Amino acid sequence: MAKNILHMMTPLAHMSPFDVNMALDAGYDATASYTNVSLGEITDLIQDAMFSRSPRDAVRTGVFIGGKDALLALDMLDAAGKALFKPFEISLFADPAGSFTTAAAMIAVVEKTLKEKKDRALRGAPVSVFGATGVVGTASAVIAALEGASVTLVARDASDRTTRHAAEINRRFGVNLAVADGSTPQSRAAILTGAEVVLAAAKAGVRVLDAGELAGAGKLLIAADVNAVPPSGIEGVDAHANGTPLGERGALGIGALAIGNVKYRTESGLFKQMTESKTPLRLDFRQAFELARTLA
């Protein structure tokens, strides 16, 4: 019987040990890592992997795309898909730095908490994303926007990097992300005045909002933080929080471990789908969100 083999590709110097462990624990028989992979090398690598097995066993071959750049990972996934043709099609899965499954989990938990505890839909909700140009922030913003939320990317400095990033996301996905200056306490206070949902997706150990800033967020319903490394990204949001009261205005906190529980099962579940499917799969943040919704 053909073995389930996963070829794991990254533009970085090292493949993530986290993802290797996840793949093997989910049911892959073997993994092979390819590092420092450029976009231009994807086609040859994909076709090298697919031609080594009979059409009957092609689906037992999978490719995972990692890295730390959400848009580059999607470009690599697109290049990989274009390299395939029948009857040698194989399964593809992009999850750079675990960001697609983490973002999917965060939005799924936020959506569920909004509905069950605030009687509020995600669609139409004003959502502010801190750490917006990172991989998790990018994916979270796109998922929320595609679900109909009114999403603002919060810029932490005076450069136009966030504006350019938002323009590229809007172009690619047909959404309408806004950008707001969050470089000063005063500008962050202005952002929080209208936010119903705040997502903290900055680097581990970086606090983006303190309790004083949150105190002025009169419309805030949910504050979600993916940072598990002290200090928390949002002051007052414990890593274990899962719809836990935050402050005195009725807002609820969702912490990194509550999100991480769903993220872990989402990534594992997608790997399992690849090992068990009888047809080739193509997985990114969209399929991750579909699964995360059932797990939240």
For the regions a language model picked out, list residue spans one by one:
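Short glycine/serine/threonine-rich phosphate/pyrophosphate-binding segments
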Residues: A103, G134-S140, T162, V206-L209, ...
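Glycine/charged-rich beta-loop-alpha catalytic/anionic-binding loops adjacent to active sites
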Residues: F85-F93, R123, G247-G250
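A glycine-rich, Thr/Ser-enriched phosphate-binding loop motif common to dinucleotide/cofactor-binding enzymes
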Residues: A94-K112
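Glycine-rich phosphate/diphosphate-binding loop of Rossmann-like nucleotide-binding domains
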Residues: T113-V197
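Adenosine-phosphate binding glycine-rich loop
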Residues: A2, V229-A296
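Conserved active-site and cofactor/substrate-binding residues in soluble primary-metabolism enzymes
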Residues: V37-E41, L71-D75, T101, A105, ...
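N-terminal ligand-binding/catalytic initiation module
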Residues: M1-P87, R286-A296
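Rossmann-like adenosine-cofactor binding region
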Residues: V175-G253
